[in-house]
Amino acid sequence: MKRSSRGFTVAELVMVTALVAILASVAVPTARFTMKREREAELRLDLRLMRNAIDDYKRLADQGMIQVEVGTEGYPKTLEELAEGVPIVGQLTKRKFLRRIPIDPMTGKAEWGLRSYQDEMNSDSWGGQDVYDVYSLSGGTALDGTKYKDW
């Protein structure tokens, strides 16, 4: 009597399961690394956009195109001012420097650490006079070992 066997043996199932587990153990850390690298690239871009907007505002203030209070350094008072727009001397419309305040990809919030021109370099507290620099409020560490707040 000939018996035809259909299906898989237990050994075959164990081998396939082990192979899938090995592949998954390699794929998950690689995916996490890739996602973190993408968020870091987005953070760099967002910081660059905001810093360029601050620099553009300062340049126009120094040229007298934006009215600033006497005794101030010519930087915006808030990030919101960059997104809402400011009146330009001799023009009817406001000039916007940012479309919107970006969301920090590390914290998931549109909240950023701020430094004013009068603050100490690398200070973690904002004096509130103006916005001279921005940084991430994330306490995390980047792939290169630096802290996000130091970027």
Predicted regions and their residues:
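Exposed loop/turn and edge beta-strand positions of beta-sandwich/beta-sheet ligand-binding modules
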Residues: 13, 37, 128
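Short, functionally important structural connectors and interaction interfaces within domains
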Residues: 18, 27, 35, 90-93, ...
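Membrane-proximal N-terminal amphipathic helix
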Residues: 35-62
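Short helix/strand-bridging catalytic loops that position acidic/His residues to coordinate divalent metals
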Residues: 32-36, 66-67
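N-terminal single-pass transmembrane signal-anchor helix
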Residues: 2-31
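Low-complexity, acidic interaction segments enriched in glycine
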Residues: 52-151
